[in-house]
C-alpha cells in the first residue's frame, strides 16, 4: 500500500481536474474515502459575481491558511467527484480543514 492510504477526510490536496477537454491543477477537499476511490469537493476562490444559487452551494473556509490555501476560499458542494486513490500517490497534501471548519462544514451539508 502506498502513501496515498494516509489520506484522511478533510485533507486538502492539489490535483489535476479536467472538464470538457480542458483542465488545471486545483485544490480539492478529500471527503469520503473508499477502498479504491476518494470522493472530493473542488475548492475555489471565485465567489463574487456567482449567482445566488451557486453561492448557496459554496461553503466558506474560515481558516483557509491552515488548509494550505493562499486566499479566502470556498468548498463547492454542488458536485461530489469520485477519483481514484491511486491518482493521489504523487500529490502533495497542502493542509486540512480546522476543527472549527470541519464542524461548520458538516452542519452546512446537513441543511
List PLM regions with ranges.
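Compact nucleic-acid interaction/catalytic patches
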Residues: 15, 21-25, 30-64
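Short, surface-exposed secondary-structure edge patches
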Residues: 1-6, 66
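A generic structural signal for short, non-catalytic loop/turn and secondary-structure boundary residues
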Residues: 8, 33, 52-54, 68-75
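Short beta-strand or tight-loop elements
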Residues: 11, 26, 73
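Membrane-targeting and insertion segments and their boundary/processing signals
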Residues: 2, 48, 54, 75-79
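Short coil-to-beta transition motif at edge beta-strands of beta-rich domains
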Residues: 5-17
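C-terminal terminal-subdomain/extension
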Residues: 61-111
Amino acid at each position: 500500500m502506498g502513501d496515498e492510504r494516509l489520506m484522511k477526510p478533510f485533507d486538502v490536496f492539489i490535483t489535476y481536474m479536467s472538464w470538457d477537454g480542458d483542465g488545471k491543477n486545483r485544490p480539492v477537499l478529500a471527503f469520503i474515502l473508499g477502498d479504491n476511490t476518494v470522493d472530493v469537493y473542488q475548492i475555489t476562490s471565485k465567489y463574487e459575481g456567482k449567482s445566488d444559487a451557486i453561492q448557496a452551494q459554496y461553503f466558506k473556509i474560515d481558516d483557509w491558511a491552515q488548509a494550505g490555501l493562499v486566499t479566502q476560499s470556498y468548498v463547492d458542494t454542488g458536485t461530489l467527484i469520485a477519483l481514484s486513490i491511486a491518482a493521489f500517490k504523487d500529490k502533495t497534501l497542502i493542509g486540512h480543514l480546522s476543527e472549527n471548519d470541519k464542524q461548520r462544514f458538516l452542519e452546512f451539508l446537513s441543511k
